[in-house]
């Protein structure tokens, strides 16, 4: 959510930020509504003050035996007019809030400009993309040959974009999730959480999924939304809270199922596990001091990178351009892992600094030490990592010519010492 005062103070700057996002200017329309609303507020307040003053005068006249009929007529007229002014104030306020709620976060100054993913900028690479003396297979071909990945059975149960993992492959996915959680909690200091998988409208609004992206979510018949990421419940834990400055940063992590309708993904990644309606992910969330959120963003991204380094998986880090960032982000790093079966890098983590954008929607604040007032916190979120896509990366990078899969050393303690699957 955007600060109306900052739009009043710098409308050109606001429109410039929207232009970088590929959007039309909106400041003038917002400020016109704001002017009309403030006029309605002033009119209502003036009528209210006059009514109160006249009522006192009426009381005094009645006590003294004077004629209060003219004042009584005036008060009656004010009472008739006041509801319309109050209603106009509320209606204009709601219209402003609706517009502000639909506008994405403005990009940070160091985010590269561009309309789409072709304008993202590579920052660094780690590791050498794996090559084989044989033709590398996609993960779905590997899983099918092992008889441990069943898309047909999942389709019979649930339709497209689901999978049933079996035996040691199911165990490997569980091991990956546990390995990630242990790394993020024990070594990186995140507090493990086990949040609800369903949230109310207010939580989905707070992190920016609503009102614009409801079609990307699954909704229950009770009105709850299935979480698309643990970012939603974890971040909203601080909604309507005033935190102590000493408590910052708050770092939380959770391994949860995630649910996405993939409404805009028709025809994309229809084979395999790359794009599923249901998947597991370890999410990292930080609630940070505004002055420290930039450094926290770099730290969070490194925490995600460490997972891939421990697993020996080559990857690259890119900074998303203005046209490819998510709705709530002011700056985003994507981590893309090398998949030999596809001969390309694919996204496995997205780490975003949302500034105070989500905090304003959630009313999440902190009280600076020694000050009476409060400030909005900054919120950050990142995958640490997507478990299913990490499973894909392990399968493709550790495949062997005989169709088996070598278990990375870092995962063997979670697999009972197992070294090879198949």
UniProtKB/Swiss-Prot annotation:
What does the entry list as the binding residues for L-serine?
229-231, 283, 383
- Which keywords fit this entry according to its UniProt record? Aminoacyl-tRNA synthetase, ATP-binding, Cytoplasm, Ligase, Nucleotide-binding, Protein biosynthesis
GO BP field: selenocysteine biosynthetic process; seryl-tRNA aminoacylation
Q: Where in the cell is it found?
A: Cytoplasm
Could you tell me which InterPro entries the record lists for this protein?
aa-tRNA-synt_IIb, aa-tRNA-synth_II, aa-tRNA-synth_II/BPL/LPL, Ser-tRNA-ligase_type_1, Ser-tRNA-synth_1_N, SerRS_1_N_sf, SerRS_core, tRNA-bd_arm
Q: Name one GO molecular function term.
A: ATP binding
Main location per UniProt?
cytoplasm
Q: What is its pathway? A: Aminoacyl-tRNA biosynthesis; selenocysteinyl-tRNA(Sec) biosynthesis; L-seryl-tRNA(Sec) from L-serine and tRNA(Sec): step 1/1
What are the boundaries of the region Disordered? 1-20
Keyword check for Transit peptide? no
Where is ATP annotated to bind? 260-262, 347-350
Q: Which Gene3D superfamilies match?
A: Bira Bifunctional Protein, Domain 2, Serine-tRNA synthetase, tRNA binding domain
SUPFAM superfamilies per UniProt: Class II aaRS and biotin synthetases, tRNA-binding arm
GO CC aspect terms:
cytoplasm
Q: What is its EC number?
A: 6.1.1.11
Which catalysed reactions does the entry list for this protein?
tRNA(Ser) + L-serine + ATP = L-seryl-tRNA(Ser) + AMP + diphosphate + H(+); tRNA(Sec) + L-serine + ATP = L-seryl-tRNA(Sec) + AMP + diphosphate + H(+)
Per its UniProt entry, which superkingdom is the organism in? Bacteria
Q: How does it assemble?
A: Homodimer. The tRNA molecule binds across the dimer.
Tell what the record comments on domains.
Consists of two distinct domains, a catalytic core and a N-terminal extension that is involved in tRNA binding.
The protein's job, in short, is: Catalyzes the attachment of serine to tRNA(Ser). Is also able to aminoacylate tRNA(Sec) with serine, to form the misacylated tRNA L-seryl-tRNA(Sec), which will be further converted into selenocysteinyl-tRNA(Sec).
Q: Which family does it belong to?
A: Belongs to the class-II aminoacyl-tRNA synthetase family. Type-1 seryl-tRNA synthetase subfamily.
Alphabetical list of HAMAP family matching this protein? Ser_tRNA_synth_type1 (MF_00176)
Protein name (database record): Serine--tRNA ligase
From what organism does this protein derive? Paramagnetospirillum magneticum (strain ATCC 700264 / AMB-1) (Magnetospirillum magneticum)
